[in-house]
Amino acid sequence: MTIDFTKLNVETRIDCFDVLDLHEVVGEAVFAGAPTLAIDELARRIFKSEGPVEMSEQEYNGLLGAVNGQLAFRVIQAIRRQAEGVDGKEARP
């Protein structure tokens, strides 16, 4: 799967979405919560990215585990929406 952390569609206010470049923020959060070397390496790829980042399903699940409690729920939802190919309000809670 591919996620572009430079173009996350984040709900910044109720029912208002903005596209934000959060690759460094997400990369640092994944790095801080990385339980394995593989997730540490993913964090570095995200942090250094200038566009979409390719990752396996296992890496994606590791990313979600690493950022749980590290990032705002709205940012995590933006990551999930992009991974699922869903925009805006259509995302599941």
Residue ranges, per PLM feature:
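Positively charged, low-complexity terminal tracts
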Residues: 1-93
